[in-house]
Structure formats: structure tokens, C-alpha cells
Amino acid sequence: MNLFRFTADVAHAIAIVVLLLKIWKSRSCEGISGRSQLLFALVFVTRYLDLFTNFFSFYNTAMKIFYLVASFGTVYLMWAKFKATYDRNNDSFRIEFLVIPSMILALLINHEFIFMEVMWTFSIYLEAVAIMPQLFMLSRTGNAETITAHYLFALGSYRFLYILNWVYRYYTESFFDPISVVAGIVQTVLYADFFYLYITRVIQSNRQFEMSA
């Protein structure tokens, strides 16, 4: 495992921990899209179906368990424990418009037409667009708490670092996975406008994050 992948995994873990701490400490999930969190949970479930059948390393298994537990923990906090604080009115993105096309694409374009491989491919496609309900919610409300902006920035950084990981692996191992690379680029592009606003408004101006009108 190279430095880019490890740093990406750290950024991803930080994003998840920041989100969980934000919800738990504030006793509120205001500003967080429950629909995006459901999609992320679905991503991890379909990606890690091999958890109990294939063992690659302790690190790999530990990270799989962490992602599964954390994602379901987030869903529980949002949809059960603190559901009274969940802003359903602004979290209205139709997630079936993401799930169904991702599944169709996974059935059509995959490495091998077997169940585990199709599910893995589905998770890659779905993860690329799973943040859209959150960004849609952010565009509707017009602003977000600084801690929520930090969460989104860490999440976007994780995917960007994975792109660097793939570039590194291409030049050092001649490894190239077009499905992962294209999906990763799409996911990073979705964050582009958010990154710009985050850097100019939250980092440089130290203000609450606000979307442009």
C-alpha cells in the first residue's frame, strides 16, 4: 500500500469520525443528508460482501468493519435516535435516480459478470454520486455549519487522493482500472465547486460556509 492510498483512507476515516462526533455532540443531524448516508451504507454493504470469505490483510479487514459499523451507526443516529432534528423537507433528492442507473450500469459494464463483481462495480458507481443528495440539500438551504463543511472537504479529499493513488500505481505497477478511475473522477468533479467555496470562505475568511445564489 502506497502513501497516497493510506492518506486517502485516513481522510475518509476522518470525514466519518467528524460526522459522527458532530451529530453526537450536538445531538442533532441538522444540515446532514440522511439520503446520502443511506447511499453510503448501501455502498459499503455491496462492496464488502466478501468480508467473511476473503482475507487480504488485518488492515483491509479492519477498515471494512469500520466503514460498515460507522455507516450504519450514522444511519441509526439520523433515522432513529435524533430523527426529530432531521431536515426531511430539504433532503428531498430522489435517490432512486442514482441507485437504478448505477445498478443498470454495473450490469452492463463490469470486470466479470458474476454476482460479487457486479455488486462491487455497483458500489463504485453509486459512491461516485452518493454525495449528490447532500450537495442538493446544501444548495437548497444555502449554508452549512463549518463542521459540516469540514466533513465534506475531507470526504472529497479522500477521493482526490485515491486518484493520485491510481496514477502512482499506473506508473509503478502498470495497474489501471478504468471503472474505478472514471467513477473517481466523476466524484471529484462533483466536489469541485464545493472545494472552491470551502477554501475561499471557510479557510481564508473563517466564515460559515454559504453557497452562491
UniProtKB/Swiss-Prot annotation:
Q: Which Pfam families match?
A: ER_lumen_recept (PF00810)
Which of the residues are on side Lumenal? 1-2, 54-61, 111-117, 169-178
Query: Topology relative to the membrane, per the entry?
Result: Multi-pass membrane protein
Question: So which stretches are on the Cytoplasmic side?
Answer: 22-35, 81-96, 138-149, 200-213
Q: Please name the GO terms that the record assigns under molecular function.
A: ER retention sequence binding
Cited PROSITE patterns? ER_LUMEN_RECEPTOR_1, ER_LUMEN_RECEPTOR_2
Q: Which residues form a coiled coil?
A: none
**Quick one: a GO cellular component term?**
endoplasmic reticulum membrane
One BP annotation, GO: vesicle-mediated transport
Superkingdom of the organism of origin: Eukaryota
Localization recorded for this chain is:
Endoplasmic reticulum membrane
Membrane-spanning intervals of the chain: 3-21, 36-53, 62-80, 97-110, 118-137, 150-168, 179-199
> Keywords in UniProt for this one?
Endoplasmic reticulum, ER-Golgi transport, Membrane, Protein transport, Receptor, Transmembrane, Transmembrane helix, Transport
Q: Name the family.
A: Belongs to the ERD2 family.
| PANTHER family the UniProt entry points to | ER LUMEN PROTEIN RETAINING RECEPTOR
Its protein name is: ER lumen protein-retaining receptor erd-2.1
State the species of origin.
Caenorhabditis elegans
Name of the gene this protein is made from: erd-2.1
